[in-house]
């Protein structure tokens, strides 16, 4: 089973990716992990990627694509995989398609966890964290018992810079501009499956399993 996982920041992709990986016994492949591994192991692609990053430049598509190709040819991908964070653009999706076609393979489904912008804003801007012990809270869904204080150590909880309304809106705008053409790409290929991400975590996973089926 070969799956592409799509969804906005704050949609819970990481949580669902872990559950899908465990349920269907396929590796969860994130571009972040691929980059870190290549760079830490000083592979030729890792060295090339790091040279761009050190100069404050974006890593070219071809480098990312080649890293993903290398990863998909490893033994643990023989029975499928879950791609998270790739493809991000139609160009990358086309490159993935071409690579799979050469191997007489194809993506089984592009799984979109769909969550309205307002819901994401509430979910992400409400997050709070304790800088001392790392405990996580949410001002609406899981607030600390003592207003503004960590239940575990008593420190003041804070909002991370990534969770401010301005930052979240910027990330969502980037996501929409980048991902809508990608959603249309998979929709036109009749490979897109959509899940309501506003449900409870277990309900989202149940919906995903209905789409993917019961076979491992």
Curated annotation (Swiss-Prot):
Region (LID): 126-163
Keyword Zinc carried by entry: yes
Keywords of this entry: ATP-binding, Cytoplasm, Kinase, Metal-binding, Nucleotide biosynthesis, Nucleotide-binding, Transferase, Zinc
Localization annotation: Cytoplasm
Catalyzed reaction equations: AMP + ATP = 2 ADP
Top-rank taxon: Bacteria
UniProt xrefs under PROSITE patterns: ADENYLATE_KINASE
Binding site for ATP: 10-15, 127, 136-137, 199
Membrane-spanning parts: none
GO CC list: cytoplasm
Binding site for AMP: 31, 36, 57-59, 85-88, 92, 160, 171
Chief localization: cytoplasm
EC number: 2.7.4.3
A Pfam match: ADK_lid
GO biological process, one term: AMP salvage
Signal peptide coordinates: none
Gene Ontology molecular functions: adenylate kinase activity; ATP binding; zinc ion binding
Domain topic, free-text comment: Consists of three domains, a large central CORE domain and two small peripheral domains, NMPbind and LID, which undergo movements during catalysis. The LID domain closes over the site of phosphoryl transfer upon ATP binding. Assembling and dissambling the active center during each catalytic cycle provides an effective means to prevent ATP hydrolysis. Some bacteria have evolved a zinc-coordinating structure that stabilizes the LID domain.
Job description of the protein: Catalyzes the reversible transfer of the terminal phosphate group between ATP and AMP. Plays an important role in cellular energy homeostasis and in adenine nucleotide metabolism.
Assembly and interaction partners: Monomer.
Stated family: Belongs to the adenylate kinase family.
HAMAP family, sorted: Adenylate_kinase_Adk (MF_00235)
Listed name of the protein: Adenylate kinase
């Amino acid at each position: 089973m070969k799956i592409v996982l799509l969804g906005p920041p704050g949609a819970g992709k990481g949580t669902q990716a872990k559950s899908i990986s465990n349920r269907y016994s396929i590796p969860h492949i994130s571009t972040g992990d691929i980059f870190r591994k290549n760079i830490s192991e000083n592979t030729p692609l890792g060295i090339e990627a790091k040279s761009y990053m050190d100069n404050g430049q974006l890593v070219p598509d071809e480098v990312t694509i080649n890293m993903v190709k290398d990863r998909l040819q490893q033994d643990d991908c023989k029975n499928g995989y879950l791609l998270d964070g790739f493809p991000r653009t139609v160009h990358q999706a086309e490159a993935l398609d071409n690579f799979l076609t050469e191997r007489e393979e194809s993506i089984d489904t592009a799984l979109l966890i769909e969550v309205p912008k307002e819901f994401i804003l509430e979910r992400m801007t409400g997050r709070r964290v304790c800088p001392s012990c790392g405990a996580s809270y949410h001002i609406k869904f899981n607030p600390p018992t003592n207003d503004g204080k960590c239940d575990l150590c008593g420190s003041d909880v804070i909002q991370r810079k990534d969770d401010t309304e301005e930052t979240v809106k910027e990330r969502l705008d980037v996501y929409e501009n980048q991902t809508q053409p990608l959603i249309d790409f998979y929709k036109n290929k009749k490979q897109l499956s959509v899940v309501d991400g506003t449900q409870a975590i277990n309900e989202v996973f149940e919906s995903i399993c209905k789409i993917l089926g019961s076979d491992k």
